Design a protein with these regions (language model features):
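Surface-exposed, interaction-prone regions used to assemble/regulate multi-protein complexes
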Residues: 1-154
Length: 154
């Protein structure tokens, strides 16, 4: 499984980050016919400075949920993030995912589950590969805690 995943990760090299969408504490990164949906703790760095994190969503004005730090920070820094190409992509032994862009931006998505005894593994991130309709006809690689699941094209 890990070898197959690494082959698919290699196909991300050179892809341009076209857009980012925020959904509560989830970040969705679009790379043309490929995407990353990050549901675990995710942060975006540039030159060793944190630009935005999924936890920033929790800092809000308590009146309008659109007034939160995640969306504010993304609006401030989006021009530094999108439009750049992937130079390198790494997967740690515990399924932390690191994407390095050609302008010094790093996208980090961390596996957030420890050993589970009573709960279940939550989806950490999902890679969608190879289709314009990414939800329907794509190869999907899903990290759930320490487990990786691979789904071939539907």
């Amino acid at each position: 499984m890990r070898e197959k995943l690494n082959q698919h990760l290699e196909t991300f090299i050179g892809k341009e980050l076209f857009d980012i969408h925020l959904v509560c504490e989830m970040m969705c990164f679009e790379f043309g016919d490929m995407a990353l949906h990050a549901q675990s703790f995710t942060r975006i760095l540039r030159n060793d400075e944190v630009l935005v994190t999924t936890l920033d969503y929790q800092g809000w004005d308590e009146i309008d949920d659109k007034n939160n730090d995640e969306w504010y920070n993304m609006n401030q820094f989006k021009h530094l993030i999108i439009g750049n190409k992937i130079e390198r992509i790494e997967l740690s032994p515990i399924n932390d995912l690191f994407i390095y862009l050609d302008n010094g931006v790093v996208i980090q998505s961390f596996a957030a589950n420890g050993p589970l005894h009573w709960g279940y593994c939550n989806e950490q991130w999902r890679l969608l590969i190879g289709s314009d309709d990414l939800e329907e006809e794509s190869i999907q690689i899903v990290a759930e805690g320490k487990n990786l699941e691979y789904f071939d094209k539907v």
